């Protein structure tokens, strides 16, 4: 039995490592032929609700690509249905919600989550992976309050988040009631994942880039602080915060009690480091480059890895998720290249 590869945890703690750790957002499913074969037999609902299937999909990229972490194959919407949100994942669209939040009474109708009762299949998947002696740390995750709220108010993905921002600006009572409810839910859900065996938590804030720094500080930051501190009060595990198009919020994020700051491809690790970030930085290859030839990918990798080693604490990842069209061999090649290029002498 090989000893466990804890490189990602060591990197975050500032301990000595043999190489820069690698994992990919959306590494589980989508681009993998084994997953596509599974989808011919089972629906997405069946895969996510059957722990054996879900654990298999979660484990695949660790076996196939040799990544330094696994991320649970779930969706950020998972805890919403149990609290009374009528959400469906529609192909080609994403999450669609029919009972949108419009008033404080709508928020008051939402229930509380009990993970053991409401999402036992999530916890059973994590336990199964732990029992199978997954050789790398497992990342659990939650959606950030703003991103979850935007889905619940808009009814689905949005280009401008007009309804979400309008509620923020004109109905603070409803807005902060919704924030509080989502923070409570996410603390409970994240804690249950950790108790089942997750060793890190990533907070996905996909749509936070819609806000400027002033509005983030007033309408969002207190909720984010309460979420992060709430998880850490119960469990001493590293927390990664990742957002899209949020370069202008790096200073605000750096002041949050997170351990890892995840960046997209719109900035650089050097710029992030130079702005005063001393935490571990995660990122940040443009996922579109995965469709490019290797001679285009390699110099971009070199730059990211050089800047990461200069910064000192770096987890290699993409600037967003893996596309379904990506060749799995490319991910395998990148992982091997990162491990080799960053091998500590």
Curated annotation (Swiss-Prot):
Under the heading InterPro entries, the entry gives: UROD/MetE-like_sf, Uroporphyrinogen_deCO2ase_HemE, Uroporphyrinogen_deCOase
Record EC number:
4.1.1.37
Top-tier EC class: lyase
Which Pfam families does this chain map to?
A: URO-D (PF01208)
Q: In which pathway does it act?
A: Porphyrin-containing compound metabolism; protoporphyrin-IX biosynthesis; coproporphyrinogen-III from 5-aminolevulinate: step 4/4
Amino acids binding substrate: 26-30, 45, 75, 151, 206, 320
Q: Identify the keywords attached in UniProt to this record, alphabetized.
A: Cytoplasm, Decarboxylase, Lyase, Porphyrin biosynthesis
Transition state stabilizer, annotated site positions = 75
CDD domains per UniProt: URO-D
Family of this protein? Belongs to the uroporphyrinogen decarboxylase family.
Role? Catalyzes the decarboxylation of four acetate groups of uroporphyrinogen-III to yield coproporphyrinogen-III.
* Subunit architecture: Homodimer.
What is this protein called in UniProt? Uroporphyrinogen decarboxylase
């Amino acid at each position: 039995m090989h000893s466990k590869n804890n490189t990602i945890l060591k990197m975050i703690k500032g301990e000595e490592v043999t190489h820069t750790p690698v994992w990919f957002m959306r590494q589980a499913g989508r681009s993998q032929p084994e997953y596509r074969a599974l989808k011919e037999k089972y629906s997405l609902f069946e895969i996510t609700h059957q722990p054996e299937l879900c654990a298999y999909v979660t484990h695949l990229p660790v076996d196939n690509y040799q990544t330094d972490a696994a991320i649970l194959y779930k969706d950020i919407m998972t805890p919403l249905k149990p609290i009374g949100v009528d959400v469906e994942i529609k192909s080609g669209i994403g999450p669609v919600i029919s009972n949108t939040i419009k008033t404080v009474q709508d928020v008051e109708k939402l229930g509380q989550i009990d993970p053991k009762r409401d999402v036992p299949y999530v916890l059973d998947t994590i336990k199964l992976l732990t029992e199978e002696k997954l050789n790398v740390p497992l990342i659990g995750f939650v959606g950030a309050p703003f991103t979850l709220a935007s889905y619940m108010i808009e009814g689905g993905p949005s280009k401008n988040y007009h309804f979400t921002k309008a509620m923020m600006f004109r109905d603070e009572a409803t807005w902060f009631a919704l924030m509080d409810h989502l923070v409570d839910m996410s603390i409970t859900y994240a804690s249950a994942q950790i108790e089942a065996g997750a060793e890190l938590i990533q907070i996905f804030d996909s749509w936070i880039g819609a806000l400027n720094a002033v509005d983030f500080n007033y309408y969002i930051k207190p909720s984010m602080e309460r979420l992060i501190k709430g998880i850490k009060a119960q469990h001493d595990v590293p927390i990664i915060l990742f957002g899209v198009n949020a370069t202008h919020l790096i200073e605000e994020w750096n002041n949050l009690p997170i351990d890892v700051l995840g960046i997209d491809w719109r900035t650089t690790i050097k710029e992030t480091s130079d702005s005063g970030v001393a935490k571990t930085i995660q990122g940040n290859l443009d996922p579109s480059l995965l469709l490019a030839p290797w001679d285009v990918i390699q110099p971009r990798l070199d730059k990211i890895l050089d800047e990461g080693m200069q910064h000192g604490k770096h987890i290699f990842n993409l600037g967003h998720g893996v596309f379904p069209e990506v060749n799995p061999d490319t991910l395998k090649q990148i992982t091997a290249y990162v491990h080799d290029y960053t091998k500590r002498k």
